Each structure stands twice: as C-alpha cells, then as structure tokens.
C-alpha cells in the first residue's frame, strides 16, 4: 500500500481519481508504516549486535535490507526479522536453546524470542530446495560465497549499521525464497516487488557465471518464469533480465500468484480443511498441479516432508 501511495503522489491531482478522505486514510497508514519500519530497523541493528557480542557473525536476510533498495524504504510493508547466523545448525540450535529451551527448529531456521514485539527467525541456512541434489548444490553455493555476505556492512538510515547480502547473492537467494513460496503455499506481491528492486540494482559482472549457477542449482526454468513476470507485469527493461523470459512458465506462475496470494490466503482451491490430514492432502494436490512445470521440486516434496519429519524428531529438545 505504501509503495502504491508513493506512485499516486507523483500523479497530477486531476488524474488521481480517488476521494480526499481515502487519500488521507492512506497517508495515515503510510505514517504508521514508517514508524513500524523504524522500529524494525532498530530491532535488526540491536539483534545483530547482540549476536556479535555472543561471538556470531550475522547477516540480515530480506526485510530491512531489501527496503534499502526502495526509493522510499520506510513505506515497504515489513514482516519479521530473518537473521542468518554463522555456525551451522547444531551450534546455532544449541546456542538458541541455551537462551530459550523450547524453541522449535526446522531444517533451515529456528524460532527465537521476539525482540520488543518484533518476531525474529534465526537461519543457519539462508534457504533450501525440496529436491535433494539441487539443495546440496545450493548449500555448497552458500558456503562458497558466505564470506562476502557476512562482511557486507551498510548504513541503515540514520539508525546504525547492519550486515546484509550483496545484490548478486540476492539474485539467487531471493529467487529460491519465491520458489519456496510457490511450492509450499503461495507467492505474495511483496516477494515479487522485492525481486523487482533487486534486479533494478543488480550490477552483474559475469552473467555467464550467474546463469551457470542457476542451471546447476535447478532454477533456470523458474528464473525464466519470474523474468516473464518482471518484464510483462512490472515493466522492467529487457536489459535488466538475468535469463530469457519464459512465457509458458511465466503465465503459469502468474496465475498461481493471482489465485493464491501470499501463503495461499486467498486460494479458493484449498478446500480440504485445516486439519493435519487436510493440510497434507492439500500439499499432495498442490504437488500434482506443479509437477508438469517443476517436476524435481514437486516429486521430491512428499519425500522431503517425510525426511523432515524425522529430522525434526532428531533435533527436538
């Protein structure tokens, strides 16, 4: 909403076409967004500093780092704080549970006590893929480039300094994040808008290497789908695209975005109930819908879900 309001402000008053009362309402909501983002900025700085004093290097993923790419970052709709903590799953899980013993862990992250009302998720892996061999390659990529990410410090407005990933890293990482939303519940507009700004700010020195990585990790077709959406819907110039747009895949993914929304909140196809059985059946139904376009991820999803059940049992407090 905040970004839409920024666009409306650039229009001549005669072209706005909405009432003054609604404009004032949006203005008030934008002011509220600014306050929330300022609070999240402060939380990101303080949580990062807290981990640093405990001996961990960190990197803020998505969120407040992405907001720096926007022309008016304080108007970006914020979420929680995702912080990548160096050290591997066993060390990080052990440390977090020494602070808060009952936090739940999954393959890539563990819950963490909220900081001044702000939700915090601690990542020991930035993201993952459901396909085991593609995920293995993705984790090797993260390990290979992590040094640059943990040392990429930027100023967060006037509030302080944080460490965030490079734009080059985000071209792959945030693509996997959007992919995970597609495979699990649904892609939201915020994820796509974030990626739009990542593309706008990307200064790709070696596009051949980037494309090689996308193919190696199994993201090539999905990247083509997102490039189609970026070009056709968001209007990004063709010169900014990282792979050739794929119209067939792009239209399919765009339809999923429009049908489901973020986390599938608006998906009328979800009719199997909210019970554990209904949720699992819904996942199978989703896999069947996706398998034609993204077979490796869709076919591995039930296997991954079973494997992850035992992983969580093993890593349960």
Please state what every model-predicted region is.
Residues 1-79, 84-317:
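Conserved NTP-donor binding/palm subdomain of two-metal-ion nucleotidyltransferases/polymerases, i.e.
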């Amino acid at each position: 909403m905040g970004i839409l309001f920024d666009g409306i402000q650039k229009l001549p008053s005669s072209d706005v076409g909405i009432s003054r009362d609604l404009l004032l309402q949006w203005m008030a909501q934008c002011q509220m967004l600014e306050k929330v983002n300022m609070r999240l900025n402060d939380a990101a700085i303080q949580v990062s500093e807290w981990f640093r004093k405990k001996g961990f290097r960190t990197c803020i993923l998505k969120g407040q780092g992405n907001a720096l790419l926007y022309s008016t970052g304080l108007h970006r709709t914020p979420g929680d704080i995702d912080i990548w903590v160096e050290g591997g799953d066993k060390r990080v899980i052990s440390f977090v549970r020494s602070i808060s013993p009952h936090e739940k862990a999954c393959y890539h992250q563990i819950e963490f006590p909220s900081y001044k009302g702000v939700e915090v998720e601690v990542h020991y892996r930035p993201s993952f893929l459901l396909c085991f061999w593609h995920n293995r390659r993705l984790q090797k990529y993260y390990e290979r480039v992590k040094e640059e990410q943990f040392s990429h410090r930027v100023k967060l407005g006037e509030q302080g300094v944080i460490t965030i990933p490079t734009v080059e890293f985000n071209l792959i990482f945030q693509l996997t994040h959007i992919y995970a939303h597609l495979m699990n519940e649904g892609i939201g507009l915020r994820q796509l808008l974030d990626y739009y700004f990542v593309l706008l700010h990307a200064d790709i020195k070696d596009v051949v290497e980037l494309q090689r990585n996308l193919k190696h990790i199994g993201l090539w077709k999905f990247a083509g789908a997102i490039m189609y959406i970026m070009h056709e819907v968001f209007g990004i110039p063709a010169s900014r695209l990282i792979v050739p747009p794929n119209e067939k895949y792009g239209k399919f993914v765009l339809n999923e975005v429009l049908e489901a929304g973020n986390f599938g909140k608006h998906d009328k196809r979800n009719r199997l109930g909210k019970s554990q059985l209904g949720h699992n059946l819904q996942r199978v139904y989703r896999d069947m819908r996706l398998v034609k376009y993204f077979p490796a991820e869709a076919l591995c999803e039930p296997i991954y879900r079973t494997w992850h059940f035992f992983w969580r049992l093993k890593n349960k407090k």
